[in-house]
């Protein structure tokens, strides 16, 4: 595709959980829980007017669903602030300091005062119907291989509650995540190539990972804003996989182009969405379709001039009918039937013909059927009509959900500025030079820069250095080597790989202190243990953390034998296998090495064993 000709514009919104000791406006812990809740809180939410007296369209759309909300609460991880039964406490200064660090790394202007606002969110993910948020910095930039990208804003806000279960009557959330500090980074829409947006997301991720942020699945959420010249701005939520970003962009552009084609064809045909909702119960009294026969009510609407367009592909494996169905599903139905895909689902051609006759459907017309309880079916068809009418506009502004296959699905209308109003329970926070300057003077090293430096300074492989940085072990690695003169590679291997294996065996690696690790590697530096014994000794230290490290090594037979003792053991093994040595000559090296290592049981360094075995064979020959 010619992205420039299409007028492709993209921007990013990245939400990153901060690794603070407590939540943004209360003292509760910021860890997630997977255990039985202590209490259930129930709420019903409705939209309120902004300061200008207007109601946000996304909030209004959610309220029309009429859902009840249940919230699971926990001791130590939730309190009355999360359930909106107590005013918020003071702003978490630690979270603000992390945001200032992020802002400085992205060349941003840090605001003088942090004002907390309320942003309406009535999908149930916030018990009060709003999210607390504030602006921390503006007007920054990052220099990328594609040129400079502007960073419009950096916000600090509360994370939302976790969705646990959704039924026809209610949605259940868990309050452990609600209130965890979240940094929101927004770029301007100046990116014009799918690969560029992936590169910028990666670079922002590098900035975030150099600061005190949470790591792991669900701790970072990336949203894409995409538009083309004849289309409209669409926000795609929850892009987790950077490798999928380019494909998501391409599929969204394909969708917008297809919707523009549908618009042009609808106008050419003088198409029309008829208002009447028809009852088809009598036509399907004897149907073999399991879905229709089990439904309380079967309703339909006629879309004049839509024939062939509902089945038109808008994304790989998704059609215009899928777009319409996504709107209908918001009213509680599992899907729709449209004439472009029938007969199917147990509906016969004769039944299709009888529907066409009953509805007086012409050759260019289409119809859509919904089967459910009567009120739900009518409500869903109202949404069908609304989405079909939006087809005359081409692309409409909306928020969509990222799917694992690179496609997207409708979530809700695009929010407007009408959902923001001032939080009166929290005073402003003055951001002074005394707070900012020490942070600016001690900025962290970016991960890629740190990795390259570690490779150069310690002669590590790129893989080992990458793992150290990725697993946040680089600082511990350097601290050990500052105090202990030892080969860097076994230190890096233990931190990057072996500790993970020890953890998989069920041992608590958090027991290990940096002091423990330094003492282990001091034994290695003093030639008191072999490199091969480092992992085993680490396991023993976890099991006896209060014992002196050298005593632990001796008690577990991990201390090295003297050179003379090692030589004697190896020569005995070689002499016992003289016939094999005479027959294979240096080819006996492998088997004899294996026998020697088995006999020595880690009490000698492998490289030394290798040398002595080789010398013993040569002496015999």
From Swiss-Prot:
The name this protein carries in UniProt is Glutamyl-tRNA(Gln) amidotransferase subunit E
Q: How does it assemble?
A: Heterodimer of GatD and GatE.
Per its database record, what is this protein's job? Answer: Allows the formation of correctly charged Gln-tRNA(Gln) through the transamidation of misacylated Glu-tRNA(Gln) in organisms which lack glutaminyl-tRNA synthetase. The reaction takes place in the presence of glutamine and ATP through an activated gamma-phospho-Glu-tRNA(Gln). The GatDE system is specific for glutamate and does not act on aspartate.
* Provenance organism: Methanobrevibacter smithii (strain ATCC 35061 / DSM 861 / OCM 144 / PS)
Single Gene Ontology BP term? glutaminyl-tRNAGln biosynthesis via transamidation
What's the Enzyme Commission number for this chain?
Answer: 6.3.5.-
**Gene Ontology terms, MF aspect:** aminoacyl-tRNA ligase activity; ATP binding; glutaminyl-tRNA synthase (glutamine-hydrolyzing) activity
Q: Does the keyword Nucleotide-binding belong to this entry?
A: yes
